[in-house]
Regions:
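PLD/PLD-like phosphodiesterase catalytic module centered on the HKD motif
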Residues: 1-130
Length: 130
């Protein structure tokens, strides 16, 4: 459980489409893991859809990243879902993704390459545009 007893899971592609965006995302793993977030890498490959579920009562599904670029510059879309059957279906999809993913451990994250460690803070400067 994350801080406050909340079950937070972050599922990311095992094979990212842009190495530099992945490097920025990965730079936050240590802090997320420290606060109890479970970070997963989807091993079959790429994930692009975004979904958020809150207490099995509401969900967001769409293409939009939760960032400045998606909300201000790009034309992304998503829907809020309040239907119990749709939320249960989404939960089944999320569980399937977790079943086909590997959990990123604090130890694994700490062993990332020196090159990534050098690039992370530099690329974070440009994160708002990625």
């Amino acid at each position: 459980m994350g801080d406050g007893g909340v079950d937070v899971r972050l599922m990311l592609p095992g094979k990212p489409d842009h190495w530099y965006a992945d490097c920025v995302a990965e730079s936050y793993f240590g802090e997320l893991i420290k606060h109890g977030v479970k970070v997963y890498r989807y091993t079959p490959g790429f994930l692009h859809g975004k979904s958020i579920m809150v207490d099995r009562e509401a969900a967001f599904v769409g293409s939009a990243n939760m960032d400045y670029r998606s909300f201000e510059l790009d034309y992304e879309c998503g829907v809020m879902v309040y239907s119990a059957p749709m939320i249960e279906s989404l939960l089944e999809d999320m569980d399937m993704i977790v079943d086909h993913s590997r959990l990123v451990t604090k130890e694994e994250w700490a062993k990332r390459s020196v090159l990534r460690r050098v690039f992370e803070p530099l690329l974070r400067l440009f994160a708002i545009w990625m």
